[in-house]
Amino acid sequence: FTAAAIRYGSTVGPEHFPNMVLDLQALLNDTPPMTPGLEHAKAYPTVKTPPELWMLGSSSDSSSLAATAGLPYNFAYFINPKIGPEIFESYRENFQAGPNFESPHCVLTIFTVCAETEKEALELSRSRDLWFIRLLRGNPGPFPSVQEAADYAYSEGEKQIIEDNRQRRAIGTPEQVCEKLDSFVRDFNLDEVMVLTITHDSGARKHSYELLSSAWH
C-alpha cells in the first residue's frame, strides 16, 4: 500500500525493479544505463568515489539480483525468518563482480530486544508479538504498548505463531543476545550482522542498543 501511494498511479511495477537497480548502478558509476532514453541522464553532485549501492531483500529473487549485479546483500531475516543459510549460499555461488565490489558480502538483519534481565526483554518484545498478529490479520495499526499486549487474549493458534517467531529472534540479556547473534554469524557464514529493535517506548529501544553495543565483541 505504501509503495502504491508513493507511485501515484504509475504503471511501473516490481517487474521493472531489476532494470531500475542496474540503471541506478550505471548512473552512479557514470556508465551507459540499460533503459533506452536514459543515456543522457547524469547523477549529481559528481564525486570522486560513487556511493555504495546495497541490496536489501527478503526473498531469493533479491538474492539472485544482488549476485547478478555484483552488489553486497543484506537479507531481512526479521521479515522472512523461514529462509535459512541457503539464501547466502546461492548468492555466493552466483556472484558476479560488479563495478564496485569484486567479491560477495553477506549481511543478516535480525530483530533483537536487549534488557538487563531476560524477563524484561521478553516483556518489551510482547509489543511486537501483538503487532505481528495484527499484521497477519491485515490490521497492524500503531505499535501497541506492553500493557496492551499483556491484556490481549491470544488464541492457541496465535500463541503458537508467536512462539515459532520468537525462536528466530535475539531477545534477552546482553550475553544471551550476543550468543544468539554469534550463532547466526556461524550458521549463515556472515560478514556482518545488523540488528533491528522496535519497542513501544523509545527509551527502551535506545537502551537496548546501548546494552548490546557495550556487550558485543
At which residue positions do the language-model features occur?
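A conserved active-site cap/scaffold subdomain adjacent to cofactor or substrate pockets
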Residues: 59-82, 87-88, 92
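An alpha-helical appendage that flanks or caps ligand/catalytic pockets
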Residues: 4, 8-42, 83-188
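Active-site-proximal loop/turn and secondary-structure-junction residues that shape catalytic pockets
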Residues: 79, 112-114, 199
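Hydrophobic faces of well-ordered beta-strands that scaffold small-molecule active sites
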Residues: 52-56, 73-76, 104-111, 193-195
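Active-site mouth loops of central-metabolism enzymes
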Residues: 47-57, 165-174
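Short aromatic-enriched loop/helix-cap "lid" or pocket-rim segments at secondary-structure transitions
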Residues: 1-5, 67, 208
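Generic C-terminus detector
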Residues: 179, 185-217
